[in-house]
Amino acid sequence: IYPAEPERDFIKTALGPALHRNGYQDLKLIAWDHNRDLLPQRASVLLNDSAAASYIWGIGFHWYETWSGTRPLYDNVKQVQQNFPDVHLLFTEGCQEKFDYSKINDWALGERYADNMLHDLNNGITAYCDWNILLDQTGGPNHVGNFCFAPVIADIAQKTLHFTNAFWYIGQFSRFIHPGAKRISSSSNRSDLLTTAFINPDGSIANL
């Protein structure tokens, strides 16, 4: 993994100045773009340096810290948001690994998306992006054999599309939480019931 200090120095001495010098200062520079496990440490090194921080619009992260058997480290997102409230936090990649066509209807697929989205939204993220919206019936194509699930699976031979439950889970969020929405307080009366709420620019309230 690219260490924090070289990334910081590259941004403040090379990439950031080059973008500004060539008229691209309006581009939104997203740093890190890896898993939640090292998110606080990486953000601290990058954002506590005022020169580097002046070029950084946001910090991106993924959900693959669970590869080692750990639970999702949602509190790391909250910690960074509290320490650097003016920096945008973005979930930039996530997918269900180890594709198995016989499991494309498993509820665990959509539930993983919902669990991650609810926790990360409540911890202050700005945006959420899936990795692959569409893959084929092998979970590819992929040049290194990293075959994964996707919200939509295309059966090339049959020329059909299968919309997994992940597609509808993600759609539930994107349908009701509009661009420019602001998160508002929400709570549930059960410890295992997750919820989040937003007020949209038109004044409507989305409670998921």
What are these regions (language model features)?
Residues 178-181:
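Glycine-centered loop/turn motifs
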Residues 38-43, 101, 140, 193-196:
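Short, solvent-exposed polar/charged micro-motifs at secondary-structure junctions
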Residues 1-97:
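Active-site neighborhood of glycoside hydrolase catalytic domains
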Residues 88-172, 183-188:
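Aromatic/acidic polysaccharide-binding cleft in carbohydrate-active enzymes
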Residues 175, 186-208:
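Carbohydrate-binding surface patches
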Residues 71, 139-141, 208:
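Extended hydrophobic-aromatic, low-complexity segments
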Residues 80-82, 118-122, 197-198:
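A general structural signal for short secondary-structure junctions and capping/turn motifs
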